[in-house]
């Protein structure tokens, strides 16, 4: 299944706020909430499916990519659900988004694809690059790159940067301090339901 490129508002109306996908919030008409499901029981499969879809659309990844992350998380030590979230959060496109260098994850992915971003002084143009503690993220020293990102930083620095990241406005540099903990996830999600959804595939 390919990456979603359709209307983002339609997705957040169905799944709720997804800050990685869009900075808009769902506007529901009064009395329209859960109209289609208020009189019938929602199946457990649908609940798991919707949690899975939240992850996929928030982080902007394909079905195959998400399944691969679940498989990696299952082989790792610790809680599969928590490891899964750590893998997704440490993607370069997400780190750029959480630092406030881009308004959304698709916006961050575009910066990476267009070679505006350096990791440890080397250009990285792979959005799925897995960041590690002590990695530092900077802007390519070109006026166009700095102008694009400086505008984002000025606006989005009002939002709190999670504890596992640091951004220096003076140096225009982001730093990955550590692997994030569960409380730093910027998404309302039940990751255990996602793991259960993939229990027969991973």
Curated annotation (Swiss-Prot):
Protein's GO biological process: ribosomal small subunit biogenesis; translation
Subunit: Part of the 30S ribosomal subunit. Contacts protein S5. The interaction surface between S4 and S5 is involved in control of translational fidelity.
Occurrences of domain S4 RNA-binding (ranges): 90-153
Family: Belongs to the universal ribosomal protein uS4 family.
Protein name: Small ribosomal subunit protein uS4c
Locations listed in the record: Plastid, Chloroplast
Main localization, broad class: plastid
One GO CC annotation: small ribosomal subunit
Signal peptide per UniProt: none
